[in-house]
Amino acid sequence: MAAARGAWCVPCLASIETLQELCRKEMLICTNIGITRKNLNNYEVEYLCDYRIEKGVEKFFVKWKGWPESCNTWEPTRNLKCPTLLKQFYSDLYNYFCALKPNKKGFLKNSIKSLDPSLSDYIVKKAKQRIALRRWEEELNRKKTHSGTLFVENTVDLEGPPMDFYYINDYKASPGVNTLGEAIVGCDCSDCFKGKCCPTEAGVLFAYNEHRQIKIPPGRPIYECNSRCKCGPDCPNRVVQKGPPYSLCIFRTDNGRGWGVKTLQKIKKNSFVMEYVGEVITSEEAERRGQQYDSRGITYLFDLDYEADEFTVDAARYGNVSHFVNHSCDPNLQVFNVFIDNLDVRLPRIALFSTRNIKAGEELTFDYQMKGSGDFSTDSIDMSPAKKRVRIACKCGAATCRGYLN
């Protein structure tokens, strides 16, 4: 459906920015969305494409927001009111020259009269990449349900958002798999920390201390209070279910490991950091997919083998921020099996807790060969029998590196 003005149509569901651009194109004043007679003819720079000095005057080739590239124009610096974009343009030039000549300090701005076509092409690609990554970042934050903010950063290459990845917050069940088990009973404690309610009913230890940090050793399961419990959201036995509390950054690594994840906040030892989620598939389907992933050298299959080995989590296409966490032979995250509403021992949730204090800006990693039991195994991530035929080199750089991911 659309509201029509002659032959001009406006989608009913459109962002304010889109409507503003349409109004400017059609020369329509609409004060409700901030388009007035004074600013109707204002143009916004989307990015800078090229540079030259013409008769002693610096000029930039400008891509205008909301207008096709055929409408790009050369503008003198005095016409541009975009100091951030100008700074970014020069930063991209500097990085480009530093990459070409690592031993040089970069370039002198005044020594450039015009840009080589290959350089201007790089500048445009970098600008488009930055826009694409910003939109992806916004999409991730719209979809995530936890309190921490997600950021995206690539200062290494021109790689953009993954083309075939869909952000989810919980397990996605494949046909024939039920991950939505409902708890039959819950506790009625007034103080779950003192009562040790749900873990005691399951015959296991209470997992957390008074600061909601893990206190049980790897290999012990976590039983949290569930939807049937009468305790509120501030219950000390509700940790994993509340989602990642930290702001994290998906960033491009500079040593050939693709994307990685770093924390933007300090994380104390034994704190919950994130869940490993994805599509839950049968072990038979994991065997088939494993052969496909094998040829591509990727590792996203995580066997749910707490007590049985019937299901696997595949985070290749569907997942959360954990999809981008890299392997390390000396990791700072540890895997734990968690049960909340679904008490089926074949379908534990996979939680990652910090093994030590982690500094802000530090990359987050876990050992792809580490089971929820804390033991090394060939039955954990990406290690179906099909995967054992090809060994994937490890690039973690740890002093204790084993040389291979599998």
Swiss-Prot record:
Entry GO CC: chromosome, centromeric region; nucleus
One MF term in the entry's GO annotations: histone H3K9 trimethyltransferase activity
Gene that produces this protein: suv39h2
Protein name per Swiss-Prot or TrEMBL: Histone-lysine N-methyltransferase SUV39H2
Family from the record: Belongs to the class V-like SAM-binding methyltransferase superfamily. Histone-lysine methyltransferase family. Suvar3-9 subfamily.
Domain remark text: Although the SET domain contains the active site of enzymatic activity, both pre-SET and post-SET domains are required for methyltransferase activity. The SET domain also participates in stable binding to heterochromatin. In the pre-SET domain, Cys residues bind 3 zinc ions that are arranged in a triangular cluster; some of these Cys residues contribute to the binding of two zinc ions within the cluster.
UniProt-annotated location(s): Nucleus; Chromosome, Centromere
GO BP annotations listed: cell differentiation; embryonic body morphogenesis; gastrulation with mouth forming second; methylation
Record-listed S-adenosyl-L-methionine binding positions: 257-259, 300, 326-327
This protein's record includes keyword Magnesium: no
Segments forming domain SET: 246-369
Record domain Post-SET: where: 390-406
Residues where Zn(2+) 2 binds: 187, 198, 225, 229
Binding residues for Zn(2+) 3: 192, 225, 231, 235
Function: Histone methyltransferase that specifically trimethylates 'Lys-9' of histone H3 using monomethylated H3 'Lys-9' as substrate. H3 'Lys-9' trimethylation represents a specific tag for epigenetic transcriptional repression by recruiting HP1 (CBX1, CBX3 and/or CBX5) proteins to methylated histones. Mainly functions in heterochromatin regions, thereby playing a central role in the establishment of constitutive heterochromatin at pericentric and telomere regions. H3 'Lys-9' trimethylation is also required to direct DNA methylation at pericentric repeats.
Domain annotation Chromo: ranges: 43-101
